[in-house]
């Protein structure tokens, strides 16, 4: 900040100060209503909810009733919980209601603050999600604050892991739902794998209040939620079919076009021009026989039955792998991997993979490990999930240091809400030692002194390993203590709640116990007797006399925010307290950024073993090092988001397609439209008005129609009638329509429509899953292009768009193939169509690396100004699938 800005800030206040000053005017209005609310009976107070809903239905806005609604919540909380919202809590509620981040210190009552915007926004009937970091906090807060909402006639749900499907659906329908961030994200992905609308649990993502917003939207931004499915069966199928292929023989043919003569009958023909292989009738029979022998196909079942659609695709991929793709020409085998060779440059393309099962088929052929690229069924980052909400807000004790990132990526402004009482915390200068052992011994000495005078101590560590090392040292010194980590949420909350007792010593990893206040004197039970309350008051006063809670940091973290979170555990709500960090030159941060200068300084000072440096200048140097690391981490997260935003845009298109399919009972019109489009393109590959008639590949068209669509049309006979190619194309389309109509007559209209929908959804899911795998490989390999002066991000966007449009075309083609070629008779049960069901599905929160981002790429990321997310696609905007059509005419 410049000197002029500092002077102006002192005179007129900072932007934050001015904003808070404006909100205080609204606080005064809420307070003016307090006596009026106090005069209401319980029934009159409860009736306010319906009154507000009626006013909203009569076109009043939520903002217009904010003052009254906040006054109602304040009075209800006072009556039900004996907790009255302080003025600063009302300000925090308004900050959240405006879709911003409220930074409020530990102990300022953020849980109570959330009731204000939650109640107001739930009046719209669209639902509010209050997001916490674990199941324990979600359940605790729902039970605790739920009493307020229940009094006012608002339904409250809790969404945690391992819930029954019906219970989860009910929870999402509640006015206000407390949920964990993980479960919300996984439910979103699971909903978009459902086959019926009734299977979905979430409704519109309306208003979210994210507690510990820095932890969820910053710390976990690089850890996507992933749903993966079983793949072992697919690997076995590829192996089984691979062993079958040598049994097939090529059909020998002579001549071209109309003059083809079969010299030696065989099991398949080859179309090298289009890089396709077609099974003959003999080949179909042999394939079925071999599959039955291998117990991959039940006896008496046709390969073209509804349940075997994917099996036929595997056979086709295996034939192409053996017949059309050659080792050391199309690909090489290197380090147990099949690596594609670019047909134009002759260079290998590490990380790239063929789709539609071809790459796995080649891996099976070459005897290398069959990669599980289809393992990921669905994936999303928290960054892109939470940006789906109409309004997003958050609260934490430490957000200001990440304000730029919140603004750039989420469009959220961070406002620091003043404390209810001025802080009395004493932040002591860091102590820096030469070695870790000296540091730990100094910590043990400090802890022992505090325990001796009855001052409670919280020792914060960066890892479970360090927690155990310090615990061992304290045990050797006979210092009684508790150790907790982030594994058992319920136990940690109990220990943290009592960490403020006289002489208590608690060792905790930095994140353990967040969300639970440390009360000086220990937590007082709600059922406490008068005597217990008196005893607690005595202990509370004794702890204050001893100096309040003392925080010991065992090392500086890479982020100042994490250090501030630890400091914030002390001196809640105006209590006394103190903090000190102990460092050594062997700590990671010091070793990387400050060790040489600091070690030189220590040597010049002639420091003895066990001595420490303690100076504000040292603190500033460490904070500068932290700023460097924070900047690097921010650049990496921003860079990764540019990649993920591409997948996010594509994900929205696919999920919208799924929703469109599930929302209608009759998809026939959509199928007919797809069929016409596919056949027109398919037809043009063989016969075109731009070609001379003798160059038409009528035989190839006939064979392809027979193989892919089970349609044996007399194309030559039709052409001999003198029809033009437009009429020929029309007859093919009509012929395929007749085939489908015949199948419908066999099974009935309703079952056929359900079958069509199932096949369309299944095909969409199958190729989307393959596309996700291909995108993942592309993202891992594209960074190498930075070395040849190409922007990897732009390369990724360009290629992924081409892959996406190709996938959409493939989906349409496969839908038409499947529905045209499937065998249906009187005994067929069309509900048996193989679906990509969710049996064996696993959810995981997977840690990802920075994708090998190098310095050059980070520089590119800095130069290319990062754009905030776009608004939702309007119905008249161009569709993001690249069709060139308006969204409403394409995927809208």
Curated annotation (Swiss-Prot):
Name of the top EC class for this enzyme: translocase
Keyword Glycoprotein belongs to the record: no
Residues engaged in binding Zn(2+): 879, 881, 890-891
Principal place of residence: membrane
Cofactors required: Zn(2+)
Residues binding ATP: 89, 107-111, 517
GO biological process: intracellular protein transmembrane transport; protein import; protein targeting; protein transport by the Sec complex
GO CC term (a single one): cell envelope Sec protein transport complex
Keyword ATP-binding on entry: yes
EC number: 7.4.2.8
CDD domains: DEXDc_SecA (cd17928), SF2_C_secA (cd18803)
Pfam families in the record: P-loop_SecA, SEC-C, SecA_DEAD, SecA_PP_bind, SecA_SW
Gene3D superfamilies referenced in this protein's UniProt entry, alphabetically: Helical scaffold and wing domains of SecA (1.10.3060.10), P-loop containing nucleotide triphosphate hydrolases (3.40.50.300), SecA, preprotein cross-linking domain (3.90.1440.10)
GO terms assigned for molecular function: ATP binding; metal ion binding; protein-exporting ATPase activity
Compartments, as annotated in UniProt: Cell inner membrane; Cytoplasm
Cofactor binding note from Swiss-Prot or TrEMBL: May bind 1 zinc ion per subunit.
Substrates-to-products reaction catalysed: ATP + H2O + cellular proteinSide 1 = ADP + phosphate + cellular proteinSide 2
Function of the molecule: Part of the Sec protein translocase complex. Interacts with the SecYEG preprotein conducting channel. Has a central role in coupling the hydrolysis of ATP to the transfer of proteins into and across the cell membrane, serving as an ATP-driven molecular motor driving the stepwise translocation of polypeptide chains across the membrane.
Protein name: Protein translocase subunit SecA
Organism, scientific name: Ruthia magnifica subsp. Calyptogena magnifica
């Amino acid at each position: 900040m410049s000197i002029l800005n500092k002077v102006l800030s002192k005179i007129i206040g900072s932007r934050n100060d001015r904003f808070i000053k404006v909100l205080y005017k609204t606080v005064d209005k809420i307070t003016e209503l307090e006596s009026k609310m106090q005069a209401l009976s319980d029934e009159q107070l409860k009736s306010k909810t319906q009154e507000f809903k009626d006013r909203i239905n009569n076109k009043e806005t939520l903002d217009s009733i904010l003052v009254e609604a906040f006054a109602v919540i304040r009075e209800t909380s006072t009556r039900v919980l004996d907790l009255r919202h302080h003025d600063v809590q009302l300000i925090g509620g308004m900050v959240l209601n405006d879709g911003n981040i409220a930074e409020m210190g530990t102990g300022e009552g953020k849980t109570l603050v959330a009731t204000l915007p939650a109640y107001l926004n739930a009046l719209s009937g669209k639902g509010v999600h209050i997001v916490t970091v674990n199941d324990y906090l979600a359940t605790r807060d729902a039970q605790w604050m739920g009493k307020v909402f229940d009094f006012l006639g608002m339904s409250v749900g809790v969404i945690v892991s391992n819930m029954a499907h019906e219970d989860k659906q009910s929870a999402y329908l509640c006015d206000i739902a407390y949920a964990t961030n993980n479960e919300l994200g996984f439910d979103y992905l699971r909903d978009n794998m459902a086959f019926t609308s009734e299977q979905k649990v979430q409704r519109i993502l309306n208003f979210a209040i994210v507690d510990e917003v820095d932890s969820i939207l910053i710390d976990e931004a690089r850890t996507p939620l992933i749903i993966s499915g079983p793949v072992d069966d697919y690997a076995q199928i590829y192996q089984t079919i691979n062993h079958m292929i040598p049994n097939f023989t090529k059909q020998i043919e002579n001549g071209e076009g109309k003059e083809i003569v079969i010299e030696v009958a065989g099991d398949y023909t080859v179309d090298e021009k289009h890089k396709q292989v077609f099974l003959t009738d003999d080949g179909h029979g042999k394939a079925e026989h071999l599959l039955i022998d291998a117990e991959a196909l039940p006896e008496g079942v046709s390969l073209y039955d509804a349940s075997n659609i994917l099996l036929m695709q595997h056979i086709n991929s295996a034939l192409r792998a053996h017949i059309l793709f050659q080792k050391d020409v199309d690909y090489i085998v290197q380090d147990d991997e099949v690596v594609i060779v670019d047909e134009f440059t002759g260079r290998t393309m590490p990380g790239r993979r063929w789709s539609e099962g071809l790459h796995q088929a080649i891996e099976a052929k070459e005897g290398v490990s069959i990669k599980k690229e289809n393992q990921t069924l669905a994936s999303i980052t928290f960054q892109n999930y939470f940006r789906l909400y109409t309004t997003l807000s958050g609260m934490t004790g430490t957000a200001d240091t990440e304000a730029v990132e919140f603004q750039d990526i989420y469009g959220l402004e961070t406002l620091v809400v003043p404390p209810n009482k001025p802080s009395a915390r004493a932040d002591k200068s860091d102590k820096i030692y030469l070695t870790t052992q000296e540091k730990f011994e100094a910590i043990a000495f400090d802890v022992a002194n505090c325990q001796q005078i009855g001052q409670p101590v919280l020792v914060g560590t960066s890892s479970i390993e360090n927690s155990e090392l310090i615990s061992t040292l304290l045990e050797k010194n006979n210092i009684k203590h508790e150790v907790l980590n982030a594994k058992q949420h319920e136990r940690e909350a109990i220990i943290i709640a009592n960490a403020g007792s006289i002489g208590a010593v608690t060792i905790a990893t930095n994140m353990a116990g967040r969300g639970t206040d440390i009360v000086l004197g220990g937590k007082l039970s709600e059922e406490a007797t008068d005597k217990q309350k008196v005893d607690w008051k005595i202990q509370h006063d004794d702890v204050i006399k001893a100096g309040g809670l003392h925080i010991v940091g065992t090392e500086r973290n890479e982020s100042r925010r994490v250090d501030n979170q630890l400091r914030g555990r002390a001196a809640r709500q105006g209590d006394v307290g103190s903090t000190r960090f102990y460092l050594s030159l062997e700590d990671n941060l010091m070793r990387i950024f400050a060790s040489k200068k600091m070690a030189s300084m220590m040597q010049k000072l002639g420091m003895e073993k066990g001595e420490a440096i303690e100076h504000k200048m040292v603190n500033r140097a460490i904070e500068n090092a932290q700023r460097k690391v924070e900047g690097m981490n921010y650049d990496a997260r921003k860079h990764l988001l540019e990649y993920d935003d591409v997948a996010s845009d594509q994900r929205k298109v696919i999920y919208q397609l799924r929703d469109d399919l599930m929302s209608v009972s009759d998809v026939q019109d959509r199928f007919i439209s797809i069929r016409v489009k596919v056949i027109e393109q398919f037809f043009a590959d063989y016969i075109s008005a731009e070609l001379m008639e003798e160059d038409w590949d009528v035989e190839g068209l006939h064979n392809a129609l027979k193989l892919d669509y089970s349609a044996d049309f007399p194309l030559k006979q039709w052409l001999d009638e003198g029809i033009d190619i437009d009429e020929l194309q029309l007859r093919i389309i009509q012929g395929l329509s007749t085939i489908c109509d015949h199948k419908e007559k066999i099974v009935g209209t309703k079952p056929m429509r359900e079958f069509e929908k199932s096949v369309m959804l299944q095909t969409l899911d199958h190729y989307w899953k393959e596309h996700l795998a291909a995108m993942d490989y592309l993202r891992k390999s594209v960074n190498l292009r930075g070395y040849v002066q190409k922007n990897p991000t732009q390369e990724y966007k360009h290629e992924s768009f081409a892959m996406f449009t190709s996938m959409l075309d493939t989906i349409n083609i496969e839908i038409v193939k499947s529905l045209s070629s499937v065998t249906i008779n009187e005994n067929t049960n069309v509900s048996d169509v193989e679906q990509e069901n969710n049996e064996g599905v696993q959810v995981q929160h997977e840690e990802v690396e920075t994708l090998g981002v190098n310095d050059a790429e980070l520089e590119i990321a800095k130069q290319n100004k990062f754009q905030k997310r776009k608004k939702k696609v309007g119905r008249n905007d161009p569709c993001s699938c690249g069709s060139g059509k308006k969204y409403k005419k394409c995927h809208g």
